[in-house]
Amino acid sequence: MDKIIVEGGQTRLQGQVVIEGAKNAVLPLLAATILPSQGKTLLTNVPILSDVFTMNNVVRGLDIQVDFNCDKKEILVDASGDILDVAPYEFVSQMRASIVVLGPILARNGHAKVSMPGGCTIGSRPIDLHLKGLEAMGATITQNGGDITAQAEKLKGANIYMDFPSVGATQNLMMAATLASGTTTIENAAREPEIVDLAQLLNKMGAKVKGAGTETLTIIGVDALHGTEHDVVQDRIEAGTFMVAAAMTSGNVLVKDAIWEHNRPLISKLMEMGVEVSEEEDGIRVKADTKKLKPVTVKTLPHPGFPTDMQAQFTALMAVVNGESTMIETVFENRFQHLEEMRRMGLQTEILRDTAMIHGGRALQGAPVMSTDLRASAALILAGMVAQGQTVVGQLTHLDRGYYQFHEKLAALGANIKRVSEA
């Protein structure tokens, strides 16, 4: 098991950093490659992450040919032959996002069996919205133990209202609807950039998806889809993480290829704090002096609100800002576990249900800490950069699910950081 060692206290990040393709986009894109019964699908700008390897194995387990060229960051998928309808348990159980293969397998085969998914332990994350939507489209759903079985000779278009704009459920239902008979409308749909990216891929495959990025999606079913080529959108969460890293170290960093519109909620809060954020031709530049930053209140919301996947990193920034900041987490429960670890570093915080009060400006001290989930891993590493002394971050399996060469990118910007293998 690896660990990351950070020598903090004097870090001031400077330079430029290249952002990878989005983890939260490529996983549903890979699920979508199950749908075409003709031709091959080529995905480019693919991030090299453990979750991507897991999803590759899920798709490959359906008797689909999957070739991952890590050097080129490309995945070529050929699902043109007959495919299996049971997703492999050993891989589905490792990752929450694997539930999005349920809709594509069902739409393609008329039958699908998927185990309950695994992944980060940051709340219950129920999948009832996925199942209700498929039932509205005519599927019969049964749950037996840890398995979900769905059956429908031919899915039918339906009007679906989602009680919550779930990203995963929107993706699952959108993919299933592409091969349904008739028109499907999804109201209160998720609006994230990753939804738009998926819709673009589906339309290149021959689907008829309209309204991506708005509250209402309309999908007109077609008889079959075909392979295509698609470039994975840039990772707004990785970009946001480096923006926060620059701000909390009084740095000056150009985040290359970052998309302003995708990061607008985060940028707004950084600017409210007093961080200088500017759009340049090849990315977004972030400059800050932490001594001049002001405390803020942030509430996480579905897009276009402040992203829950930036909550942990932003609380690390709050820790270095003089005064009392407030973080309200409305999307997932149980997502303040990283603050318990940061208390070991001297953070003063009070947590009451969905709200954390951060008493910032007091010097953090290096300490051994453990990652509790993907984004917490990044937050603890960032906190280590500004803490006095050495911080050792363990349990890096979470980090590798969503960040590629994170420590190397930080080191290139000036951080005193290394990754070592534990004996």
UniProtKB/Swiss-Prot annotation:
UDP-N-acetyl-alpha-D-glucosamine binds at R96, R125, P126, I127, D128, L129, D309, V331. Its main location: cytoplasm. One of its GO terms (cellular component) is cytoplasm. One of its GO terms (molecular function) is UDP-N-acetylglucosamine 1-carboxyvinyltransferase activity. The active site is at C120. One of its GO terms (biological process) is UDP-N-acetylgalactosamine biosynthetic process. Pfam families: EPSP_synthase. HAMAP family: MurA (MF_00111). Belongs to the EPSP synthase family. MurA subfamily. This is UDP-N-acetylglucosamine 1-carboxyvinyltransferase 2. It comes from Streptococcus agalactiae serotype III (strain NEM316).
